[in-house]
């Protein structure tokens, strides 16, 4: 994936509520995985904190979602896409905290 000046990186960190069951976490992860099928997504990665122990590395989150879009217009399409909206509708109640970093 070669970067162009219009590309948008959309990095979302999720802190899930402490009382979530393993089944709920699995369902959450599976729902995140569906977001890769949104046609404007050029790059997709879901993960959990890597076992890196450095003072500057934050490993307190539960899941990381990294998406890359061709441009801001594609990002905007993603925001209103039915799969994204379904994910939010189903799982928003499980978020304890969400932090988003968007960069171009």
Which residues does each PLM region occupy?
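Short S/T/G/P-rich N-terminal loop/turn motif that feeds into the first structured element of a domain
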Residues: 1-62, 70-77, 104
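Conserved short beta-strand edge segments in small beta-sheet-based binding/regulatory domains
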Residues: 41-46, 90-102
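C-terminal structural segments of small proteins and small subunits
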Residues: 66-68, 72-98
